[in-house]
């Protein structure tokens, strides 16, 4: 699956190498 960046508005497609929290989902 693709990594999605966790943001206040939901999950945005993000890079897994970035220092941030992630969730797995589809939007």
Swiss-Prot record:
Give every LCN-type CS-alpha/beta domain span.
1-27
**Localization:** Secreted
One annotated GO molecular function = sodium channel regulator activity
Instruction: List the InterPro entries.
Output: LCN-type_CS_alpha_beta_dom, Scorpion_toxin-like_sf
- Is the Secreted keyword given for this protein? yes
Q: Which UniProt keywords apply?
A: Ion channel impairing toxin, Neurotoxin, Secreted, Toxin, Voltage-gated sodium channel impairing toxin
| Keyword hit for Secreted | yes
Gene Ontology CC, one term: extracellular region
Tissue specificity comment: Expressed by the venom gland.
Q: Which domain of life is it from?
A: Eukaryota
Q: Which family does it belong to?
A: Belongs to the long (4 C-C) scorpion toxin superfamily. Sodium channel inhibitor family. Beta subfamily.
Function text: Beta toxins bind voltage-independently at site-4 of sodium channels (Nav) and shift the voltage of activation toward more negative potentials thereby affecting sodium channel activation and promoting spontaneous and repetitive firing. This toxin is active against mammals and also affects neuromuscular preparations of frog.
Comment text on domains: Has the structural arrangement of an alpha-helix connected to antiparallel beta-sheets by disulfide bonds (CS-alpha/beta).
Name listed for the protein in its UniProt record: Toxin TdII-4
Specify the species.
Answer: Tityus discrepans
């Amino acid at each position: 699956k693709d990594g999605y960046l966790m943001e206040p508005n939901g999950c945005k497609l993000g890079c897994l190498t970035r220092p941030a929290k992630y969730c797995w989902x589809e939007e």
